[in-house]
Swiss-Prot record:
It comes from Arabidopsis thaliana (Mouse-ear cress). This is 6-phosphogluconolactonase 3, chloroplastic. SUPFAM superfamilies: NagB/RpiA/CoA transferase-like. One of its GO terms (molecular function) is 6-phosphogluconolactonase activity. The lineage of its organism: Eukaryota, Viridiplantae, Streptophyta, Embryophyta, Tracheophyta. Plants silencing PGL3 exhibit reduced rosette size, constitutive expression of the pathogenesis-related genes PR1, PR2 and PR5, and enhanced resistance to Pseudomonas syringae pv. maculicola ES4326 and Hyaloperonospora arabidopsidis Noco2. Interacts with TRXM2. It holds the Pfam family Glucosamine_iso. The gene is PGL3. Coiled coil: none annotated. GO terms for biological process: carbohydrate metabolic process; cellular response to redox state; defense response to bacterium; defense response to oomycetes; nitrate assimilation; pentose-phosphate shunt.
Length: 325
């Protein structure tokens, strides 16, 4: 079966013994936003929304790290959207780890599995607290199913590989079963690899590992963890590229990426936006303009501005990334 390629390769290439020997292992949100009130000390008191649809609020019990907490809701949708701004990147990753671990606990208890999608780039570094105590010992890693929102069509031991990045910094440090790590078949062409990955996802839907969104018919991942480029791209969906408008396919190939390597595969926006929870993690002043454009939705809105979620979208920003808001 076509789907077996994805599963077999996820097993073969998730184990370090099967990697090649040369792979080295060891004024925005008008009218309906909420913003924190600054305390007189060096700490900040943030507000969060407990039920955005009703407008009710509560004080957050954690006033240690957040500089601001903003919230809004999409008109006509139940989706919740939060923007969390942190004084230091280190504090951001602490809260991101708790956010991820809490969702893992929720879905493992509710459905016996936790489907997680990651991007490449700086996002993987932001997951570093998950491989430390207490999470490395408390998370039910055996129930995780691990995917990539996009991948470069290169060997898995190549420096451009999102698989290698995730393996070196994350997968090699946690006991996710190798068969639950879904890597692409990089021996195929970009187009064939995209088709193979989509077939793999459909098989997981048929076996009830992946849910399907009742509203869109696309796969519904439990958590999508995304980074954003300085140009506002997410996954391998770049500003002005036609793939941003793809509305039918789950996974597509790209052969003309403006960033090398040129050949990649990527989830489409309907798949990304059908996720239950999405975290968009952005750090650094070099991305501040794209953050501003994505959240204010003015001018040429970058792809990141098109990201949504069925249950909750959370932007995790450090102060430099939020400096133009």
């Amino acid at each position: 079966m076509a789907s077996s390629s994805c599963f077999l390769r996820s097993i073969l290439f998730s184990s370090p013994t099967n990697l090649r020997s040369n792979h080295h292992l060891p004024t925005f949100f008008p009218k309906n936003y909420l913003i924190c009130s600054h305390s007189t000390s060096s700490r900040f008191e943030s507000l969060s929304v407990s039920s955005i649809g009703t407008g009710s609020t509560k004080k957050s019990s954690d006033t240690r790290r957040k500089v601001k907490s903003m919230a809004t809701t999409n008109i006509g949708k139940e989706e919740k959207k939060r923007v969390e701004i942190y004084d230091l990147e280190e504090n951001l990753v602490i809260d991101l780890a708790k956010f991820t671990a809490d969702l893992s606990d929720k879905f493992c208890k509710e459905r016996g599995a936790f489907t997680v999608v990651v991007s490449g780039g700086s996002l993987i570094k932001s997951l570093r607290k998950l491989v430390e105590s207490p999470y490395v010992d408390s998370i039910d890693w055996a129930r995780w199913h691990f995917f990539w929102v996009d991948e470069r069509v290169v060997p898995k031991n190549h420096d451009d590989s999102n698989y290698k990045l995730a393996y070196d910094s994350f997968l090699s440090k946690v006991p996710i079963p190798p068969g639950n790590v879904y890597a692409i078949n990089e021996a195929l062409s970009a187009e064939a690899a995209a088709d193979d990955y989509e077939t793999c996802l459909k098989h997981l839907v048929n076996t009830n590992i992946l849910r399907v969104s009742e509203s869109t018919g696309f796969p519904k991942f439990d958590l999508m963890l995304l980074g954003m480029g300085p140009d506002g791209h997410v996954a391998s969906l770049f500003p002005g590229h036609g793939l941003c408008n793809e509305s039918k396919k789950w996974v597509v190939s790209i052969s003309d990426s403006p960033k090398p390597p040129s050949e990649r595969i990527t989830f489409t926006f309907p798949v990304i936006n059908s996720s239950a929870h999405v975290a968009l993690v952005v750090c650094g002043s070099g991305k501040a303009e794209a953050v501003e454009a994505a959240l204010k939705k003015t001018g040429n809105v970058p792809p990141a501005g098109s990201v949504s979620a069925e249950d909750e979208l959370v932007w995790f920003l450090d102060k430099p990334a939020s400096s133009k808001l």
